[in-house]
Amino acid sequence: MSIRRAMSTTASKEWRDYFMSTHFWGPVANWGIPVAALADTQKSPKFISGKMTLALTLYSCIFMRFAYKVQPRNWLLFACHATNATAQSIQGLRFLHYNYGSKEQQA
């Protein structure tokens, strides 16, 4: 019975309209940035660009606000940018520690 209800829900116009809208496909396409940032946390910090990390952090913070303010609220986009802001902040801390940390720890 629940399968039948799920099928009727997914066949509804509202459901199709959501999955064919930019409110869905925009965040889906955008998830590549935080996934790449999370994957890069396993790589050496000598390859981190401080300027790009800062730019991506600010970009995600700005668009988190946009995703919250737009009506209807785009929680999928908000989650994407929150994840990216967190991942980029981690990368930024790794960059700072590697480039400006104490020289004794780097040796």
Curated annotation (Swiss-Prot):
Indicate whether Signal appears among the record's keywords: no
What organism does this protein naturally occur in? Drosophila melanogaster (Fruit fly)
Gene Ontology terms describing biological process: mitochondrial pyruvate transmembrane transport; pyruvate metabolic process
Assembly and interaction partners: The functional 150 kDa pyruvate import complex is a heteromer of MPC1 and MPC2.
State what protein this is by name: Mitochondrial pyruvate carrier 1
Role noted for this protein: Mediates the uptake of pyruvate into mitochondria.
Report the family membership.
Belongs to the mitochondrial pyruvate carrier (MPC) (TC 2.A.105) family.
Subcellular location per UniProt equals: Mitochondrion inner membrane
- Which gene codes for it? Mpc1
Q: What does UniProt give as GO cellular component?
A: mitochondrial inner membrane; mitochondrion
Q: Which UniProt keywords apply?
A: Membrane, Mitochondrion, Mitochondrion inner membrane, Transmembrane, Transmembrane helix, Transport
Q: What is its main location?
A: mitochondrion
Ranges that cross the membrane? 18-39, 52-68
